[in-house]
Amino acid sequence: MPAISNDWKEKLMPEYAKPYYKKLFDFVKEEYSKFIIYPPANDIFNALHFTPLKNVKVVIIGQDPYHEENQAHGLCFSVLPGNQTPPSLQNIYKELNNDLGCFIPNNGYLKKWADQGVLLLNAVLTVRAHNANSHAGHGWEQFTDAIINIINLENRPVVFMLWGAYAQKKTELLNNPKHLILKAPHPSPLSAARGFFGCKHFSKANNFLIENGENPIDWQIENL
């Protein structure tokens, strides 16, 4: 697995010393040697590479990476250029259009958000090709919970967007009154109409950031 070189490195050092991480490291290494695994190994930690801790303003939590070829690149909900926009992200774009008037772009590449401080964190950071959730229960959840804990302890306001029951379980890790926790159903076509549409999380996040002296996020993804 690639090394993390920014300010996450020191904060995550205690995790690397724990027995679960050694097991996780060995499991992931073996999986990449035997199977097609997504994302490519160099992209596993892109959420952390693109969004240093000091820059984190918003956290969006996903479950595990896309499991088809050339989609996943280490940011939840995001796909590499050249892919069709997945259904959940299409619904995120619809809500952005309704909430902030953002036009719906022709791609699903969300690095622009990550570069502005939106941590796009999957709870599980790898997956076997064509086999959703195949790497669940091997230690990634403990590692990404540690990331959430680190952000929770930050003495500055951060917005957490928790979409769907899986992400909302993470509320038990969040007890810092400085932060804003926004909850809605998942943007999946199965649940978006039950309250994701109309949640206005993006404007709520920006209003909170502005109220706390931070620059808002430019949520508009440009056409490629």
Question: Where do the protein language model's features map onto the residues?
Answer:
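A polyanion-binding, active-site-adjacent surface
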Residues: 2, 7, 14-162, 166-169, ...
